[in-house]
Amino acid sequence: VKRPMNAFMVWSQIERRKIMEQSPDMHNAEISKRLGKRWKLLKGSDKIPFIREAERLRLKHMADYPDYKYRP
């Protein structure tokens, strides 16, 4: 069972698709670096919808898998 996505992962999933549409030849490592920089530059208020969605996913995950324990 996978862990629920955090706010960055929720946001980056959307943004990664946009970058890949614009620059299909860009390497995944470069996309990841750009996403990290852009996330850090986002204002807290712009992150709120993604934080809320991540919390919703976390609560759903807890309900779906009540005995789940993260084991790396």
UniProtKB/Swiss-Prot annotation:
One of its GO terms (biological process) is brain development. It is found in: Nucleus. One of its GO terms (molecular function) is DNA-binding transcription activator activity, RNA polymerase II-specific. GO terms for cellular component: nucleus. Keywords: DNA-binding, Nucleus. This is SRY-related protein AES1. It holds the Pfam family HMG_box. The keyword Endoplasmic reticulum does not apply. SUPFAM superfamilies: HMG-box. It comes from Alligator mississippiensis (American alligator). It comes from the Eukaryota.
